[in-house]
């Protein structure tokens, strides 16, 4: 029975054989590696991946697709919403310390998935995701560009990232209205030891009104926190490099510790 793509899951299925091969080559799976695929769909990537790996764990929310995938002897199927999956437990079950994570992420929840995975970065070796190209542009953007924002800062803090492949709409069934691309994400070995919640709040405040100078947003927020050290708020959020946001978060944490003693 033919599976009909469900709009509520944001399903677009990859059907171009040459493109599938190029994506699998970019991922570079090797026999015995512990890999998890998010949203395998109709197994376009799953089949060539499992042929190279020998075994693959897949996370699929769609009940019909999960049932179909269970018939494959080399697949371990987790039927779940990926946002509820504990990747540390998955690594434990696979008796490994590091997972490779791949997937053609549903466009409507790609950002929440990326933030969810941040919680499990210690058990992740690398990530390869197909996403809307516009999302990847935001992930890898540098300061002083329109694409630079909260996503850029939060992800660049923890990952080295690159856009490795462009995937045109005609590679899919049904074709999406947007261009897609594949991003490679490799966790930094020694990221800045910043409090993630504090950084997230700081960056959210900074980018809450992109067009305004930071003194209207971040400046006031820093004042409320009783922080009076040097930080140039006579510029816009997009003009501040990642390293400066990290340095500010570190100083803020030290300041609030000192204030509470």
From Swiss-Prot:
Matching PANTHER family: DIMETHYLADENOSINE TRANSFERASE, DIMETHYLADENOSINE TRANSFERASE-RELATED
Molecular function terms from GO: 16S rRNA (adenine(1518)-N(6)/adenine(1519)-N(6))-dimethyltransferase activity; RNA binding
Function: Specifically dimethylates two adjacent adenosines (A1518 and A1519) in the loop of a conserved hairpin near the 3'-end of 16S rRNA in the 30S particle. May play a critical role in biogenesis of 30S subunits.
EC code(s) of this entry: 2.1.1.182
Family statement drawn from the similarity comment of this UniProt entry: Belongs to the class I-like SAM-binding methyltransferase superfamily. rRNA adenine N(6)-methyltransferase family. RsmA subfamily.
Keyword Protein biosynthesis: no
Gene: rsmA
Transmembrane segments: none
Subcellular location(s) of the protein: Cytoplasm
Name the record gives this protein: Ribosomal RNA small subunit methyltransferase A
């Amino acid at each position: 029975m033919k599976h009909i793509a469900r709009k509520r899951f944001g399903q677009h299925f990859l059907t171009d054989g040459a493109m599938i091969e190029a994506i699998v080559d970019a991922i570079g799976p090797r026999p015995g590696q512990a890999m998890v695929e998010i949203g395998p769909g109709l197994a376009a990537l799953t089949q060539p991946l499992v042929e190279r790996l020998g075994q693959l764990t897949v996370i699929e929310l769609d009940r019909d697709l999960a049932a179909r995938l269970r018939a494959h002897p080399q697949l371990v199927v987790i039927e779940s919403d990926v946002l509820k999956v504990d990747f540390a437990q998955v690594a434990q079950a696979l008796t490994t310390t590091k997972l490779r994570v791949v997937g053609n992420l549903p466009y409507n929840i790609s950002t929440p998935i990326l933030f969810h995975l941040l919680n499990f970065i210690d058990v992740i070796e690398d990530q390869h995701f197909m996403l809307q190209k516009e999302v990847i542009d935001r992930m890898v953007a540098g300061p002083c560009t329109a694409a630079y924002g909260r996503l850029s800062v939060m992800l660049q803090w923890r990952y080295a990232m690159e856009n490795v492949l462009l995937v045109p709409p005609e590679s899919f069934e049904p074709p999406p209205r947007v261009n897609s691309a594949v991003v490679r994400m490799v966790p930094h070995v020694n990221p800045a030891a910043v409090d993630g919640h504090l950084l997230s709040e700081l960056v959210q405040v900074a980018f809450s009104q992109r067009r305004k100078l930071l003194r209207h947003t971040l400046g006031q927020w820093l004042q409320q926190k009783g922080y009076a050290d040097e930080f140039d708020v006579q510029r816009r959020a997009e003009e501040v490099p990642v390293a400066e946001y990290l340095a500010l978060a570190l100083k803020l944490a030290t300041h609030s510790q000192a204030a509470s003693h």
